[in-house]
Structures are given as C-alpha cells and as structure tokens.
Amino acid sequence: MSTLKIESTDLPKYLLLILYIITGSLSNYGAIDILAPQWIYLGAINILSCLYFLFFSPNTLSTAFRPLFKSVFIYLYLFYIVWNALSYFYAINPVETLINLPRVGNTFFAIFFCYFLIYNLPNKFFFISRLFLLFLIAELAAYYNDFVTVYPKEGLNVIAIKGFAGNKNITAASIAFKLPFVLYLLHSLKRPLYRFGLVVVLFGGVLAVSLIEARAAILSSLVVFLLFLLFQVYLLVIKHYTIQKGLINIGLTILPYLIALFFNLTLSSTANKGAITDTVGRIAFTEESSNGRFQYWGDALDYVKKHPIFASGLGNWKIASISQGKEHISGYTVPYHAHNDFIHVFTETGILGGLAYIGLFVCLTFYLLILLYNKYKAQGILELQYFFLLLPFIVYGIDAGLNFPVARPLMQSSLALFAGLILGLYLDTNNKEQPILSPKPLLQKSILALILLLLIPGLAVHIISFRSLQKQGPLLYEFNNAQYNLTRAQLDDISHDFPNLTETAMPIKSMKARYYYLQGNKEEAHKMALEGSKDNPQIFFGENLKAQFLLQEGKIDSAYVYAKKAFEGLPNNMPHYDMYMKTLVAKREVTTIDEVFETVRALAGDTKIIWTIYIRSLAQTRSLGDPFAMDKAATAYQLYPKDETIFSLYRMLTYGQQRMVEAEQLNVQAAEAYNNKDFITAARLFQQCFDKDPMQHTYSLNAGLAFYEGKQFDQAIQYFDLALTSKNEDTKERALRYKGLSLYQAGRGPQACAVFLKLKNQYPKRMYQQEFQKYCFSNTNN
C-alpha cells in the first residue's frame, strides 16, 4: 500500500472532507432533536464548498464536472430533487415540504461536492478509509465515555449510552458502517503497530454494536464479518497464500470479534441483561420480532396503492400515516417514519419519486460492480478495495431497510463521502478510458452560482426550524405532563406558522389553544383549536380540544359533534375515546356507550383505561343495582382487582355512592374511637362501615383488629375470615396473621398453628417463621 501524500494545493479539499465527516458530532444545542443543528452545519459546509469551487478551484471543476454530468446518476438525482419540490403542490401540509426540501437538497449537494473534492485526489480510497477510521475512533471515544459514566450507576442502559447520536440505533448504524474501512486498513497496512491499533478499534466497534442491542446493526455487522471471511478464503485459494499468511489474515479478523463476544457475555451477565446471543436469537422477519415494522410497512404500501403518483408530499408521511394506522394509534405518538427509507420515499413522492430514489442506489451498485469486473478482467482476481466498498453499502442498505438513516445528518454525511468516493473512482476510471471535453468555465460558474442561490435560503429554513425546535421543548414537556404554565409572551415566542407542526406532528396552533382557553381567551382558543386541524387534519387533536371547550360551556350537542369526529378519526386514541364517552354520558346515549366500548375493546383489548372509562360512564348513566352494569363492573374488577378506581366504581354500581360516603364518615368516627383505646366502640362502628360497604374489606379487617384489641377473639376471627375473601394481598396477609393470633389467644392452639403454618408458607417472611416457632413449638397450647 502506497503512503498518503498530501499536496499543499489539495489541503482545502482534505479540510472540507474532514468538515463533512464531523457533521454527526454536533450536539443538540437546546433543540429537542439533535438533527436540527446538524442540518444547519451540513448546509453551511455545502455553502463553504460551493464558494471554494466557485472562486478557488477552477481546475477541479474542469476535470470533474463533465464526467458527472455525463452520468445517469446525476440526472436521476436531479429528477428526484425536482419531483420532491413539486410535491409542494399536492402535499397535505406544504409547510412541511418546505422544511424538508432543504434536507433532501443538503444530502444531494453534499454528495455533489464530496465527489468534486475526491475526484482528483491521489489514493482516494486510502484517504477516505483513514477519514472514516478517525471519525470512528472519535465516535467510540464518545460512546465509551458515556459507558463509563452510566454503567456503574445504571448498568447497560442502552438508551443513556449513545455517544454522538440522538439514539442507540443511529449510533450502532454509524459504527457498523465504518467497520469495513477498519477491516480494509487492517489487511492493507503491514506495520505491526498499525495493525495492533486497528485490532483494538475493531474490537471496540464490534463490542459497542453488540452492547447497544440494535438488531439491524448487529445483523449487518454479522453479514460483513461472514462475507469478509469468505473473501479471505477466496484469496487463500486464488492467490495461493501460504497457510500461515491465510491464518494470520483470518485470525486478525476473528480475534476482535471473539474478544468482543467474551466481553459482551461478561458485561451482560454482570448487568443482568440479555447477551448478544439473545439479541441475535431474536432476529427474525416476523411481526412479533419487528417492533411494529410490518404494520408500518403494510400501512405505507397500502397508502402507495391508493396514491401511486401524487402521494402525501415530502415530509408529510407523518400526517398521512395517522389515517392509515388509526386503529393502532392509542395516543398522539404517530408513526412519523415508515422504518424503511425506500418505502417511506414512495409514501411521500409516489412511484416516480420512489423509483428515482431506488435508482440512485442501483446506479451506485452498478458502478461498484463495473469497477470490480474491470479489475477482475484486467488482473484475474477481485480487487481488495472494491470488494471492501461493497461492505459499507450492505450495512447502509440493511439500515435503510429497517430504520430511517435518510433523516439523520450523521448517516447522510457518511453516505455523501461514500457515494462521492464511488462516483470519483468510477467516473475517474471511465474518464481516463474515454476522455471527455471540459464544459465552458462560464457554464460551470453559472451552475455553482445557482446552487449557492439555492443553498442560502435552504440554510435559512434550517435555522428557523432549529429555533422552533429549541422553543418547542417546554411546550411538549408541559403537554406530556398535563401542565399549562407557559405565559402568553412565551407562547407568542413559539412560531405556529412556519413550522406549524411540532417534530411529533402535533399542530402548534391547537396546542396553544388550550393555554388561551385557560387564560380566559375563549374565543381565540376556539378559533386556534380548529386552525391547527388544518395543519394536521388526520390527528383530530383540535376537534377533541374543541369538544372539551364546548362541554365545559354546557353546549352538549356541539361538543358531541366534535367528539364524535375525533373518535371516528382515531378510535383507538384514549383521549378521544374518553371525551366521546363524556359527551355520550351528557346525552344519556346508553346504547351507544356500550357500542363504543366494544369498538375500542376490539382494537385495544382489555386494557385498564378503557374499562375504567366505560365503568365510569355506566355509573353515570345506569340506575343503582342495574344487573348489566353490575355484571360489567364485576368483569372489570376480575381483570383488575388491585385497581382502586375500578373497585370504587364497582361498589358504586352495586350499592351506591351514598352508602360509600356514609361508610367513610363512620370510618372516621371508628378510627377516632380506636385511637382513644375505646376498642369495642370502634369495632361496632367498623361493623356498621362494613354493613354499608361490604365489598370494602378494609372495614372488616379493622373491625377484626378492634375486636382483637378488645379481647373479643371469637368475633375478631369472624371478621378476619371476611377480610380473607378480599382480593387485596396486604389485607389478606394481615387478616391471616391476626386470625392466627386470635386463635392462639382464644386457646385454640392447633388451629392457630395451622394458620401460622399457612401464613409462613404463603408469605415467606422471617417474622412469620419466628412466630410459628414461638407459638407452635416454644409453648404448650390447649
């Protein structure tokens, strides 16, 4: 391998390439998503590159410009960009298209400029490999810095240990993407010290991927590992390596993986977490193991069938996905990405945009295969570096098929360098074989000037979006915690026009409406609630909010209309279900209440919240002792015997709230008597409590305890037996213990011992073991 020589005239190119690769190292700077400042940075580097080529590097343009514009790739990409821009005219929310278009353009121009920067460099592949290696070392340093901070306190908390990236999947994918370049350098460099260092980096990368538990990254890393081993066997046979050399090459690859596996098993065992072997065992292309991806893909493909040409519009799948998946969206967390970049593009730009996007990767694959074939044809053997170029492509492809790297600047900056390298290698080779005349300098300058004019407003959009994401944080925090403390001045500081949706697709106007209503600006609140619905017409948050306002104002029929619309739009959304039920209660629509419950139950299953809302609605609309209502309440209580709300509603439907209130009032008197040592009076009052509220076994337990303290042991036993029928384990445990003590005090030793034996077996506590020994072996009982 030749050494890397850097000419002084090429220094700006190397510097710009370094600036591209560090895109993913930026923090969030107060924004709710780390991508916002990274898009700004990537846009700024594109502008810097454009200025460099426009004013300082005409030679690069003269040699690299025309080959690119003779390729299919550039025209396919230009069509893709233009079609994305045209989606503004049919997008559900055109503002989202304007916000996302500069992101698509950023990746395009990053590839465009990386190609220009790489095209004339000597040893292109070697330099880019080293560049990826250096950034990987930085990524691993950040990851393990988090690791040593988090692990002693929280163990293998993969959510908290994330390095540069915003989440674990991005961290793992980014590391996995760069590992093939480490393998390439490991088998290209010959100095022992270099190779040792690369083995350490490879070990650190593989261990990080295994600990993060991101299955897509683990799968792609395993594929890379197996393909590389097969390639080593191929070289051993074709190149006739000695057994010693072949084993060294294979050993240098296997050793870091084996050591990483050992460390993974050790750390996972220490932290009581699943090891990588468990994660690999869960890799399967089934609905159960896909974390909902099959559902996302099915919804997305169904949408494309319905909208083959004019789909949702760039950036609008997070809106369109709501109506597609409305039966399994239980809150306001929407599937804003299809978890497959290729399918996702189809959902936003239709068949034309989707095919163009796939075509870009087909082109790059074709260029790689041509490079491999030409080298094989010339040398009779597969070229090492071109084979290695296939491996990160596989990693990116698997990640794009299961996640959404297209939305992450960390992955897009790496893709830009990688695609620029492939284009540089392929077009440089073809250009040498078939010389192409350079275009006129004026045309080159004009194109770059046009690009600059596009990049500057794109950067402005990124900055506006970033500032909005900074300010959305408090708004989303209060929304998620049902707190509404922001002042009018703070609300006015958050733009609701551009962007008009939060990062989670919530309409900002509607979110502000709740504050306005609470602050007394009711007319404005009503208006803003519905204005927000225009920005995201699929989430029905504004309609549900409008129903709340109207119900509070006593306008039941109007509230019902909006609540019904919100419920039918998202029937599995619990706030919508709750509000619709409240309006049905207000209208006394008893039959519809049952129908709505069964509809939601079929979607959500027997969850506690749907039963609670339903039983509450029955309690407000059915008469006392209604057999149907009591039967439903009993079913809910059987499902959730420990839930106090359901238990209270069950009792309310059975014998009425008045008796429950009277029992609570008597309970206060009983507790006062008990505290004053008037145990028999307390016991009689607790008896009355239990007579009025016989399902509340706390009263029977307290009656038993009062009789016990009053030395009325037979009566105490009677009430402890009643308490033992409770579904509350704490109540049953105390009742069983004091029954044993009462039996012992009543002189019924054998019966007491039987109870103590049951107590220590059913509730294995040291105290009960000691009491069993004390009362059943230390003394002689009657």
Regions found by a protein language model. Give the residues of each.
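TM-adjacent membrane-interface loops and short helices in multi-pass inner/ER membrane proteins
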Residues: 292-335, 342-345, 349-356
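Start-of-helix register in tetratricopeptide repeats
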Residues: 469, 507, 541, 575, ...
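TPR/Sel1-like alpha-solenoid repeat signature
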Residues: 512-516, 528, 543-550, 562, ...
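Transmembrane signal-anchor hairpin modules in multi-pass inner-membrane enzymes, especially those
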Residues: 1-85, 94-99, 106-133, 185-196, ...
